[in-house]
Amino acid sequence: HEAIPGHVWEGEYSNRLPLIRSVLAFNPFSEGWALYGEQLADELGAYDEFVVGRLGYLQSLAFRACRMVVDTGLHAKGWSRAQAVNFFVERNGSKPAEVESEVDRYCSWPGQATGYKLGHSRIVDQRARAETTMGTAYDFKAFNDAVVLGGNVPMDVLEKNVGRYIASGSI
């Protein structure tokens, strides 16, 4: 998540952009890219011979899904802190002490926790769109470059950036 191809790679690419674009921060892009980086590690075989590592990766996916439910529960459904902690305990197998500070963060930063999985899902959706539209012209590396070279952008701009990649590669 924090390393390559996650935030480190995203940061390296952002250093190539004009200053104003390198300082913009859109949580769904940044955290979504980092989760997508975790997925890339899995797809590229990082866990093929490390079963416990893959289990940790899968557990982290479940944790991120719980985050979305808990953040929404707290801010849209009127959940208490105790309900949020209990959701993690019951649904993810977390220990209360492990998630209490997480829940406190969600209480003080509405919507931040949902950005991880929302951004990841949008990047995955855009990749599927590129693969489907481009067929054999789709290039895995070029797609990923198009995403990160576009900079840390809102999700609607990401879609436009991928659209330009598709148009340039489909010709």
Question: Which residues make up each language-model segment?
Answer:
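N-terminal maturation segment of proteins
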Residues: 2-171
